[in-house]
């Protein structure tokens, strides 16, 4: 079976970790080119040491390379603004190319593998939301498939050391993109996202808190749905886990809570507490926020490539 060749744009933390994952674990994918803009970057130097072709001239440099003719997938780990330009350039040069967007740009549909990848296998561009979205949206969706979710709020706490310049430059986009995806993918009527950069030393692992307000439903059914969804995420992010038991609170009709922008609410409040430990392929174990993004992106592209192979076999 022919592996699909891959280029990664962005030689920072996320791009480098993703490269190492593909080199070690790629089933349908083969690492071909690492693209950066800083000739002195550690990511480009590491790629060269690992035998991967590189360019420090951005997406323009990639398109000038002989290897570009064989590239089927491009992962973009730059920034929201850069991705818009990168996608346009790639699409003009190669209309059928598959682009996996790890920025908050969201040109294509939001993709959270365990929730909606099957609906997006044939998209030309998919957006991996954010680290907080990849960790928490599965929990919102787990409740949503049992009961109607009116409101979901997530708080993602990540180690300050794991937040590179791209993450820091995209804080506003993080909250906006995650909030929208909580609604569109998670199924919540209204979503809200908060990110906290924790400066603690030694750095703490990624922690996520998810508050979900839904119609009254069986607490046992919701807890079972959450456990099942957590196991599905663990299939591609082994360090993903429930930190403690799911907590429930019934909010009675005669004592509703008032949510600004949503209104008065009564029903069931579900609280989910998560921890994400990184696989430490390139990044430290505390950087679970970056690991879950690269793991989700790899799982998405692998399944897309597998579907392409199956389709090619069916028409052969």
UniProtKB/Swiss-Prot annotation:
Q: What is this protein called?
A: Acetaldehyde dehydrogenase
Pathway listed: Aromatic compound metabolism; 3-phenylpropanoate degradation
Q: Mind telling me which residue stretches traverse the membrane in this protein?
A: none
**By its UniProt entry, which NCBIfam families does this protein fall under?**
ac_ald_DH_ac, PRK08300.1
* Protein family according to the UniProt entry: Belongs to the acetaldehyde dehydrogenase family.
* Keywords, ordered alphabetically: Aromatic hydrocarbons catabolism, NAD, Oxidoreductase
Question: What EC number(s) are associated with this protein in UniProt?
Answer: 1.2.1.10
Under the subunit heading, UniProt states: Interacts with MhpE.
User: What top-level branch of life does the organism fall under?
Assistant: Bacteria
According to its UniProt entry, what is the function of this protein? Answer: Catalyzes the conversion of acetaldehyde to acetyl-CoA, using NAD(+) and coenzyme A. Is the final enzyme in the meta-cleavage pathway for the degradation of aromatic compounds.
Task: Supply the HAMAP family for this chain.
Answer: Ac_ald_DH_ac
Catalysed reaction(s) here are: acetaldehyde + NAD(+) + CoA = acetyl-CoA + NADH + H(+)
Q: Which residues bind NAD(+)?
A: 11-14, 162-170, 289
A Pfam family hit: Semialdhyde_dh
**GO biological process assignments:** 3-phenylpropionate catabolic process
What Gene3D superfamilies has UniProt attached to this entry? Dihydrodipicolinate Reductase, domain 2, NAD(P)-binding Rossmann-like Domain
């Amino acid at each position: 079976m022919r592996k699909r060749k891959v280029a990664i744009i962005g030689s920072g933390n996320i791009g480098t970790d993703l490269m190492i994952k593909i080199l070690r674990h790629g089933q349908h994918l083969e690492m071909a080119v690492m693209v950066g803009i800083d000739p002195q970057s550690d990511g480009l130097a590491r790629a060269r040491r690992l035998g991967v072709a590189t360019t420090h001239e951005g997406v323009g440099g990639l398109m000038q390379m002989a290897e570009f003719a064989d590239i089927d997938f491009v992962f973009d780990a730059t920034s929201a603004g850069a991705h818009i330009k990168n996608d346009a350039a790639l699409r003009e040069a190669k209309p059928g190319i598959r682009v996996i967007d790890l920025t908050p740009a969201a040109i294509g549909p939001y993709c959270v593998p365990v929730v909606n990848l099957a609906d997006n296998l044939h998209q030309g561009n998919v957006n991996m939301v954010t680290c907080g979205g990849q960790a928490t949206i599965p929990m919102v969706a787990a409740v949503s498939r049992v009961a109607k979710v009116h409101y979901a709020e997530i708080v993602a706490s990540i180690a300050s050391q794991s937040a590179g310049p791209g993450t820091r430059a995209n804080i506003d986009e993080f909250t906006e993109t995650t909030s929208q995806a909580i609604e569109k993918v998670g199924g919540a009527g209204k979503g809200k996202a908060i990110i906290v950069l924790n400066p603690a030393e030694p750095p703490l692992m990624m922690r996520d808190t998810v508050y979900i307000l839904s119609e009254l439903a069986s607490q046992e059914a919701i807890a079972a749905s959450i456990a099942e969804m957590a196991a599905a995420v663990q299939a591609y992010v082994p360090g993903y886990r429930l930190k403690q038991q799911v907590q429930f609170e019934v909010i009675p009709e005669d004592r509703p809570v008032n949510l600004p922008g949503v209104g008065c609410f009564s029903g069931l409040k579900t609280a989910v507490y998560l921890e994400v430990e990184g696989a430490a392929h390139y990044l430290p174990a505390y950087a679970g926020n970056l690991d879950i993004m690269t793991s989700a992106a790899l799982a998405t592209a692998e399944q897309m490539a597998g579907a392409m192979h199956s389709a090619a076999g069916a028409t052969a």
